[in-house]
Design a protein with these regions (language model features):
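Metalloprotease/metallohydrolase-associated module, dominated by Zn2+-dependent proteases
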Residues: 181-265
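Short pre-active-site segment immediately N-terminal to the catalytic Zn-binding motif
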Residues: 137-155, 202-205
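Noncatalytic modules at the cell exterior or secretory-pathway interfaces
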Residues: 286-288, 330-347
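Catalytic Zn2+-binding segment of zinc metalloproteases
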Residues: 158-177, 213, 222-226
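Bacterial N-terminal signal peptides
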Residues: 11-21
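Auxiliary, metal-adjacent structural segments of Zn-dependent hydrolase domains
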Residues: 73-133
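Edge beta-strands of jelly-roll/beta-sandwich modules across compartments, strongly enriched
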Residues: 301, 343-357
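Non-catalytic extracellular/lumenal accessory regions of secreted precursors
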Residues: 255-288, 296-298, 310, 316-321, ...
Length: 357
């Protein structure tokens, strides 16, 4: 399961953060079906060293009103609003209705939302922060601040909450993004090329796929709400979502990836059978791959994972028991492989099971 994490959304009064990211992403611009809006001189970025911590939240000099609130959907959300905000402008019920109107799953019932003034938010999240999230607690303003609406902040932070409750082994969704979106965005291969930096809330914030996921979720939900204006200010344009990425994001929210799939098959090697058994392996998602093989007694069969070109050997299974062989590997952008079994020693039946993301 994803581990607890902290995120803070803050304002930077310069565009230096994105300068490096724009250069790094130039090679990726051609693949985008849509174009991100131009980034203004005021970019959004994370503030270093100011994560949401329970102690800071508890110590904040803020009086809250509200609590568990049942909305028109029948769902209950725990919303607390600062007394410093006028009741007519920021009621717990209003924000609870907004939250249950977001694209969401069952994770919404685990969330506690604190809506305050900008001063309240910055006393909890940091002096430049517009919002923050950690461990099922979300802090956001109830008023527009520096041209950023509270809805925009809440959508971004709720994206982190979704990732907190999604699984993407062998990685953590909150840093890499949920599985389907991360696969479409080729996060694994980008990390290997030093083009993405999971969990980096500092100088590589704009290339942090966890933040790119949160922004993709925000944009996806804004489109669902009929908002046509597009803003993409805090993450590298190389992560600006295609239609395929938006569809994958929606699926990650509404139909979360749950577990790997295991399939098994067998083949009998005899004196007149083919000397090599090839088995095609489809890998539509990135993640962990395992091959288990049971060979005949007295057999030392070669069980290899081979790339789609039929030539490159990715790895070979090793004995883990008298007749059992195993291979663990990672799928990182490859959409298919082959399992190649070559008999050595005693002939007979070989059983192969594959576990894919």
């Amino acid at each position: 399961m994803p581990h607890p994490t902290s995120r803070a959304l803050a304002v930077l009064l310069a565009s230096t953060l994105l300068a490096g990211a724009l250069a790094a992403s130039a090679a990726h611009g051609a693949r985008r079906a849509l174009s991100p809006p131009l980034t203004s001189a005021r970019a959004l970025a994370v503030e270093l060293g100011t994560p949401l911590r329970a102690a800071r939240l508890a110590a904040a000099d803020v009086t809250w009103r509200g609590g568990p609130t049942t909305t028109s959907t029948g769902e209950t959300v725990n919303v607390l609003v600062s007394d410093a905000l006028p009741p007519e402008a920021a009621s717990p019920s209003r924000w609870a209705e907004f939250l249950t109107g977001l694209t969401h799953g069952s994770e919404i019932s685990d969330l506690t939302v604190y809506v305050g003034t900008l001063d309240d938010v910055q006393s909890i999240c940091g002096q430049n922060a517009l919002g923050c999230y950690a461990s099922d607690q979300l802090v956001a303003p109830g008023e527009t601040a520096v041209d950023v609406s509270p809805e925009e902040v809440i959508r971004h932070e709720y994206g982190h909450h979704i990732a907190q409750h999604r699984s993407n082994p062998p990685w953590t969704s909150v840093e890499w993004g949920p599985k389907r979106w991360a696969t479409v965005e080729n996060v694994c291969a980008r990390v290997a090329r030093n083009e993405a930096y999971p969990g980096d809330e500092g100088s590589n914030y704009a290339l942090n796929p966890g933040e790119a996921w949160a922004e993709t979720y925000r944009l996806m939900d804004e489109r669902k709400a009929g908002i046509t204006a597009v803003s993409w200010r805090i993450v590298s344009p190389s992560f600006f979502p295609t239609e395929q990425a938006l569809e994958a994001a929606q699926q990650d929210v509404l139909q979360p990836w749950a577990a790997p799939e295991t399939t098994s098959t067998s083949h009998v090697f005899g004196k007149r059978s083919a000397k090599v058994w090839w088995m095609r392996l489809s890998t539509p998602l990135d993640g962990s791959l395992r091959i288990n093989a049971t060979v005949p007694v007295g057999g030392t069969y070669d069980v290899a994972l081979v790339s789609a070109n039929h030539r490159t050997v990715v790895g070979r299974a090793q004995f883990v028991g008298q007749r059992a062989k195993r291979l663990d590997a990672s799928v990182c952008g490859q959409r298919s492989f082959f399992v190649r079994v070559t008999p050595k020693g005693a002939l007979g039946r070989v059983r192969v099971s594959t576990t894919t993301p």
